[in-house]
Amino acid sequence: MERTAFYFKDISEKNRLTKQRGVTLLEIIIVLGIIGVIAAGVVVLAQRAFTAQDISDIQNNTNSIRTSMAETFQDEGEYPPATATTVTLTKGNIATTDDLAPIVTLNKLGKISPSESFNGISGDAFQIGQALVDSGSGVHKGFVILISGLDQQTCRNLLSQMGNQWDYVGIISAPAGEDESAELNGTELDADKKAGSVLKSLSVAEDITSTDIVSEETCNIGGANNGIVFGSK
């Protein structure tokens, strides 16, 4: 009788321990799940923070470049053209290379630093081209700066924050690392407004609206292949 009682007691104890182990495993799974959710959230927040910082840097850097371009070239008759080799520049050689790109000239003159010369999103040096303020003239009295390698969300974000600070805003296909000098040079700052292509120009005395920015035609080039062309007279 005692042996039987001991037997049942032993089984009961084993069942209790088994249940304890099961609960412990379940708790571990729950904890790991919570950690996974938190980690995923942290990654998303970190990515947003990095993107926000990149956008802030682009704003500051392009403003510095805009001021420096005017100081350097405004009295020279016309602005210089973009070069096809701008995309090959690095922070290590941008201030010493023989390349005639405007961004190189600004570095050599000490107007801007190498760290201000690059788009933090695409990793490319800013491509700067000459532009026509009056499409009926052959003299390039304006210039444009390209921000390349943008996905749709970042492209629209930049438009909302920077678009109305410039005289001209256009959208082109511009993947990271791709030369766009031919398209930039000769940009007409007085071009007609065109949905998804020319959002602002000297011919239209209108600011870019939120409706323009969220239009299906705006920044709709797949992947991170959108480029914004900001122009100044």
Q: What residue spans do the PLM features occupy?
A:
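N-terminal leader/signal peptides at the extreme start of proteins
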Residues: 1-21
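Intrinsically disordered, low-complexity regions enriched in Pro/Ser/Thr/Gly and acidic residues
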Residues: 110-233
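Short, glycine/small-hydrophobic-rich surface segments
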Residues: 72-109
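Glycine-rich anion/phosphate-binding loop at the beta-strand->alpha-helix junction
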Residues: 58
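N-terminal alpha-helical signal peptides/signal-anchor transmembrane segments
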Residues: 49, 61-80
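N-terminal signal-anchor/signal peptide hydrophobic helix marking the start
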Residues: 21-33
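C-terminal juxtamembrane segment of a hydrophobic transmembrane alpha-helix
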Residues: 32-53, 71-73
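Short, charged/polar micro-motifs that form catalytic or ligand-binding hotspots
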Residues: 28, 48-55, 144-148
